[in-house]
C-alpha cells in the first residue's frame, strides 16, 4: 500500500466475526508483495458495575485507524464505538475512520411530531465529538443523514451487489418491501 501512514483495522466486539471476513476479502484483493492485512489487537475491560473500556494492545500512533462496528441495538454497541474512537485519538492515531455497516438510530432522521429527538443527528454529533475523521456506512435510512456530519461520509449502496445477485437467482414472484416511506425509494 503506497501511503504515508500505515493502515490499521480494528473491530469492536459486535463486529469481530464480520471484520474477520472483511480482512479475508481484503487480503484476496491485496497485490503481491504488499503484505497481508491483519485485524489489529484490542481488548475491552469490563468493570464490576458493567462499564467497559476499550483499549488497543498495539501502537496506533501515526496510523490511519479503521474501526469496524455496527451500531444495532443494544446501545452499548454505539458506546463501544465512541469509546474506541476516543481511545484511538488519545493514542495519537493520524486519522480514525468508523466503518459502520449498520447506522443505528438512522430511522430517527427528522422531527415527525412534537417533542421527539432526532436520533440520527445526535449520533452524528456524538461520533464527531469522539473524534472520528470519516464515516463509512451502508444503506442509510435517508440520504439527508449525510448532511448531519461536518466530516466526509461514504454512503455505500448494497444494491450495486444485491440486485445483480437477486437477478441471478431467477426467482419468480419475488417481492421487495420497505419498512416505511423513507425506504420505499430504495426498495
Where would I find each of the regions flagged by the language model?
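PRPP-associated nucleotide enzymes
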Residues: 1-187
Amino acid at each position: 500500500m503506497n501511503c504515508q501512514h500505515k493502515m490499521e483495522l480494528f473491530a469492536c466486539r459486535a463486529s469481530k466475526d464480520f471484520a474477520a471476513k472483511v480482512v479475508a476479502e481484503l487480503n484476496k484483493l491485496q497485490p503481491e508483495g504488499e503484505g497481508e492485512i491483519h485485524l489489529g489487537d484490542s481488548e475491552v475491560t469490563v468493570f464490576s458495575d458493567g462499564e467497559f473500556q476499550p483499549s488497543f494492545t498495539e501502537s496506533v500512533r501515526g496510523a490511519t485507524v479503521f474501526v469496524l462496528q455496527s451500531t444495532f441495538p443494544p446501545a452499548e454497541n454505539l458506546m463501544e464505538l465512541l469509546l474506541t474512537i476516543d481511545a484511538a485519538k488519545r493514542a495519537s492515531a493520524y486519522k480514525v475512520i468508523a466503518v459502520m455497516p449498520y447506522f443505528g438510530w438512522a430511522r430517527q432522521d427528522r422531527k415527525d411530531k412534537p417533542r421527539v429527538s432526532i436520533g440520527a443527528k445526535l449520533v452524528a454529533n456524538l461520533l464527531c465529538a469522539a473524534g472520528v475523521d470519516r464515516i463509512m456506512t451502508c444503506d442509510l435510512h435517508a440520504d439527508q443523514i449525510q448532511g448531519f456530519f461536518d466530516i466526509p461520509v461514504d454512503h455505500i449502496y448494497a444494491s450495486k451487489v444485491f440486485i445483480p445477485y437477486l437477478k441471478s437467482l431467477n426467482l419468480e414472484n419475488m417481492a421487495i418491501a420497505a419498512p416505511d416511506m423513507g425506504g420505499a425509494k430504495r426498495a
